[in-house]
Amino acid sequence: MTDQSHQCVIIGISGASASGKSLISSTLYRELRDQVGDQHIGVISEDSYYKDQSHLTMEERVKTNYDHPSSMDHSLLIKHLQMLKSGQAIEVPQYSYVEHTRKQETVHIELKKVIILEGILLLTDARLRNEMNFSIFVDTPLDICLLRRMRRDVNERGRSMDSVMEQYQKTVRPMFLQFIEPSKQYADIIVPRGGKNRIAIDILKAKISQFFE
């Protein structure tokens, strides 16, 4: 059993790509950090744990299906969560969507009372679910997610609208229907309407605040 002084609460936030997961995660982090201090709460993105592809050619890397569970290094993520729970610091990998592989640098994270973990495939892995104290699924209509994703990938990741649409049709939507949507059944809380659902955010804040008492 984990020593009381080293307890780290893991809260999983999942949902479709561009559903509002990151907005909810960042809002919760920012508002709770202002209450308790950043030494007590942190955020980890599942995106940081895409598998290293430095051994592949660029031609091979660009074919990666980022919406399939096999693209994730969940074993490393689970190891890192267990390290945090045992009081150890971790080095979170960083991923380059331009190079389609991990960067050289990492982000150092010390033990926190609460870690907010966000990502599209979190609830698809039973091992990962077992590491969470509770989980949230952000339930946003796919057409809204597509519009948000197109804006994000064109503006922030330098992609063309045609390539974003092609990826959506070939992998994003099929993988959502095959893996992500079915994982909703494992969520403890379902949040409709994405990251601007203020009532849901306030309820989640109240729930998470209990872990700081």
Curated annotation (Swiss-Prot):
This protein's name: Uridine kinase
Q: Cite the source lineage.
A: Bacteria, Pseudomonadati, Pseudomonadota, Gammaproteobacteria, Enterobacterales
Broad enzyme group? transferase
| Family statement | Belongs to the uridine kinase family.
Please name the Pfam families in this protein's record.
PRK (PF00485)
Q: What is its EC number?
A: 2.7.1.48
Q: Which reaction does this chain catalyze?
A: uridine + ATP = UMP + ADP + H(+); cytidine + ATP = CMP + ADP + H(+)
HAMAP family this protein is in? Uridine_kinase (MF_00551)
Listed binding positions for ATP are G15, A16, S17, A18, S19, G20, K21, S22
| Primary subcellular site in the record, as a coarse category | cytoplasm
Q: Name one GO cellular component term.
A: cytoplasm
Q: Which locations, inside or outside the cell, does it occupy?
A: Cytoplasm
Gene Ontology biological process terms, A to Z: CTP salvage; UMP salvage
User: Per UniProt, what is one GO molecular function of this protein?
Assistant: ATP binding
Which keywords are on file for this protein?
A: ATP-binding, Cytoplasm, Kinase, Nucleotide-binding, Transferase
Which superkingdom, per the lineage?
Bacteria
